[in-house]
Amino acid sequence: MAGVEKIKERILEEARAQAEANIKRAEEEAAKIIEEAQKEAAAKKAQILEKAKQEAVDVKKRLKAMAELEARKKKLQARQEVVDEAFNKTIEKLNSLPDREYEEIISQMIVNSVESGSEEIILSPKDKQRISPGFIENINKKLSQKGIDGKIKLSEETKNISGGFILKSGDIEINNSFEAIIRMKREEVEAEVIKALF
């Protein structure tokens, strides 16, 4: 019986040793899995943080670029407003010239624009009241001096222009209003105006 007890005890001891070895191996594997999981989590965390940092840098760059673009747009808009104001002031100055001087400028413009000498002149309602009674007669004299048959007429019609005139020949109208002239000349002189203003 004592031999059976010894065998039984030995089997139990081996089973215990085997169980302890299995437990130890399982604990080591669990520790290894936990360590690898922690390393992987740390790597993912670092990756996520790096990605977030890069996205933050990208967002910052985009915001900066947008802000710079907006600032440039506002600067250009402000510059455009100043240039517009300069051209508008030119029209205002022309319109506020003394009547005699204004009439002389318009008269010279008409003489330089006429081709046949039988065109009609259309003015704004304000300018029609502003010109002297001999305005058309003086233009026709100047045309005759240039060798053009001076038969210019002042049209009954008026146009809503701030200054200048419209030259009408049959169905054709040539817009010589200050706005139209400034608009045409603006492209030619705008760069110089910008250089002078800024």
Curated annotation (Swiss-Prot):
It comes from the Bacteria. One of its GO terms (cellular component) is proton-transporting two-sector ATPase complex, catalytic domain. Signal peptide: none annotated. Disulfide bonds: none annotated. Keywords: ATP synthesis, Hydrogen ion transport, Ion transport, Transport. One of its GO terms (molecular function) is ATP binding. One of its GO terms (biological process) is proton motive force-driven plasma membrane ATP synthesis. Pfam families: vATP-synt_E (PF01991). InterPro entries: ATPase_E_C, ATPase_V1_Esu. Produces ATP from ADP in the presence of a proton gradient across the membrane. Belongs to the V-ATPase E subunit family. This is V-type ATP synthase subunit E. The lineage of its organism: Bacteria, Bacillati, Bacillota, Clostridia, Eubacteriales.
